[in-house]
Amino acid sequence: AKSPFGEIFIASTDKGICCMEFADEHDAAFNSLRKKFPNAKFTSIVDEVQQNALFIFTQDWSKLKEIKLHLKGTDFQLKVWETLLKIPVGGLTTYGDIAVGINNPRACRAVGTAVGENPVAFLIPCHRVIRASGELGNYHWGEIRKTAMIGWEAAKGEVKRGL
């Protein structure tokens, strides 16, 4: 599907969205998805769950229904991803802030690893995490895309720092 930030691949189960990735190359993205879910049956349809998730990329969120996620990860990863969901639109936070927020202040690097393993791009807003120095830091789908997302969200409202 198309998004303001490029092609996006969305995969869902009957429980919710399990994967959402930016896909510069369709075949490579699909092969990556097949490796992550080797026992899955794939169909090339956009269902209601996926269509609803695409509303996140519109300026009008009035049509957006609750988005259900079906995530698989370690307890630590799930805790980090849950914390990412608390960062407001237009907000930024640091790996250290997240580590403190999950009561593990020395786990900055582990937080960075968990952020990098986020399976649901944009919906779990790992792009809102920056380095303590103010630098953007790494982003799985590229620094240019991360910059564009932060700018797009900032245009929707006031930029905030912290959780």
Regions from the PLM with identified roles:
Residues A1-R106, W152-L163:
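Basic nucleic-acid-binding alpha-helical/helix-turn surface characteristic of O6-alkylguanine DNA
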Residues R106-A121:
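Regulatory, non-catalytic segments
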Residues F122-V129:
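Short Lys/Arg-enriched helix C-cap and helix-to-coil transition segments
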Residues A132-L163:
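…primarily DNA-binding HTH/wHTH and HhH modules…
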